[in-house]
Amino acid sequence: LTQKSLPNAISVGGRDFSVNTDFRIWMRFAMEYREWSLSDDKTPLDIRYLFKNSIPVFTDINEYIGILQFAFPQNVVPHSDSSSGDDVLFYQYDGDYIYSAFMQAYGIDLLETDLHWHKFLALMNGLPDCTRLSAIMGYRSYTGERNKDESTIYRNLKEAWMPPYEETEEEKKAEE
């Protein structure tokens, strides 16, 4: 929110190129990029659809960085080493859940709305926990580590709320 506008161009070779900013286009790119990154076939992706007017000529692998930074902007926080690194959102499968989450949380009909990719991502990051999509992403991010913490917490709560232990007459006699 420190700037009044969102980015709408990518720099390649020192020159700015206008990009289509609609979330649907970048969702498509995110799906294609994920599939490409998991594949052994490293044929360059056809990304011409990302650009509005002129299409840059890429001469170096580092010139693609602007596209990746636009597609997958990094948030400064939260910073954590505990992330499993697993994907928790799959656009090709989660479309219904994304749609319903935006409708439920924000009253936004994604089929009727033009939305900048970065606005879309900000709203995704801010989805309340009460949406089905948030629950699904929580299931997908489960590592089992939390389970240890929960069992310790519940054990401590159980001990805190149990009535004081009273020795039976037999136990008292056995101690004597």
Predicted region positions:
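Charged interaction scaffolds used for protein-protein
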Residues: 1-18, 24, 34, 42-176
